[in-house]
């Protein structure tokens, strides 16, 4: 997979793309990152990329020219047409399902803006996806783009050490993940559940399943509405409702 980032602040990406899973993914040739400063595509001598909005109002708006030229340059060199993603508060809410969908693509291109917003022609004529990471406002699109990229890249074949790791993650199954424990079994009187120490794999799997359902029921009950529950899982929920 290839992932391009169009940004005015390329230095923001250095630490994230050069660390942890994203770095390992590059070393394994699972992904190739390219960070491009679209200010370099500005066609005026001052390299400005923003201007005042027509009709007045506060803030500055990203001009279409540098963004259009940058996207056209990158796509002209691409082996496959990329998904062009605009990260913005008005976009589709990002979910694990969306990450899985994007992980099947060959090429992603993120447009990371700053200032008040984008010229609407960017949104209407360049973008294939508009994605939001939540109902809040950030200074720019760089952090959301990196978060989305991280979520997507870890799903690529061979990136994680244990292939089942991402399948067991919260949301991959439609539920929140069960609790995890490691050594020591007793830390300052805080003990690991006996079931996990029993060596009985069937009991351990049942415990994890139950705790996953419990955690989802308590913290994100909305996720259970569309989740196909077994008879046993329904019994557990019925018991908790009586508590």
UniProtKB/Swiss-Prot annotation:
Subcellular location: Cytoplasm
Enzyme Commission code(s) on record: 2.1.1.228
Biological process, per Gene Ontology: tRNA N1-guanine methylation
Position of the signal peptide: none
Gene Ontology molecular function, alphabetical: tRNA (guanine(37)-N1)-methyltransferase activity
GO CC, alphabetical: cytosol
Superkingdom of origin organism: Bacteria
Gene3D superfamilies: 3.40.1280.10, tRNA(m1g37)methyltransferase, domain 2 (1.10.1270.20)
InterPro entries: Alpha/beta_knot_MTases, tRNA_m1G_MeTrfase_C_sf, tRNA_m1G_MeTrfase_TrmD, tRNA_m1G_MTases_N, tRNA_MeTrfase_TRMD/TRM10
UniProt keyword annotations, A-Z: Cytoplasm, Methyltransferase, S-adenosyl-L-methionine, Transferase, tRNA processing
List of residues binding S-adenosyl-L-methionine: 113, 133-138
Catalytic activity: guanosine(37) in tRNA + S-adenosyl-L-methionine = N(1)-methylguanosine(37) in tRNA + S-adenosyl-L-homocysteine + H(+)
SUPFAM superfamilies: alpha/beta knot
Chief subcellular location: cytoplasm
HAMAP family hit by this protein: TrmD
Subunit comment: Homodimer.
Function field: Specifically methylates guanosine-37 in various tRNAs.
Record-given protein name: tRNA (guanine-N(1)-)-methyltransferase
Gene (UniProt): trmD
């Amino acid at each position: 997979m290839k992932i391009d980032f169009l940004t005015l602040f390329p230095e923001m990406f250095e630490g994230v793309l050069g660390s942890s899973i994203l770095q390992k993914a590059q070393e394994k040739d699972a992904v190739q990152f390219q960070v491009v400063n679209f200010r370099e595509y500005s066609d005026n001598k001052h390299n400005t990329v923003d201007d005042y909005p027509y009709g007045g109002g506060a803030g500055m708006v990203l001009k279409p020219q540098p963004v259009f030229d940058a996207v056209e340059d990158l796509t002209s060199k691409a082996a496959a047409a990329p998904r062009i993603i605009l990260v913005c508060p008005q976009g589709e809410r990002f979910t694990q399902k969306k990450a899985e969908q994007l992980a099947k693509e060959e090429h992603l291109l993120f447009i990371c803006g700053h200032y008040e917003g984008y010229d609407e022609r960017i949104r209407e004529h360049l973008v294939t996806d508009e994605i939001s990471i939540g109902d809040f406002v950030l200074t720019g699109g760089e952090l959301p783009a990196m978060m989305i990229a991280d979520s997507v890249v870890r799903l690529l074949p061979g990136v994680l050490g244990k292939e089942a790791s991402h399948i067991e993650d919260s949301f991959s199954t439609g539920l929140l993940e069960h609790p995890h424990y490691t050594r020591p079994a007793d830390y300052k009187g805080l003990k690991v559940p006996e079931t996990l120490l029993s060596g009985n794999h069937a009991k351990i799997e049942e415990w994890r399943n139950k705790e996953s359902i419990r955690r989802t029921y308590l913290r994100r009950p909305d996720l259970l509405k569309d989740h196909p529950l077994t008879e046993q899982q329904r019994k557990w929920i019925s018991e908790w409702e009586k508590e």
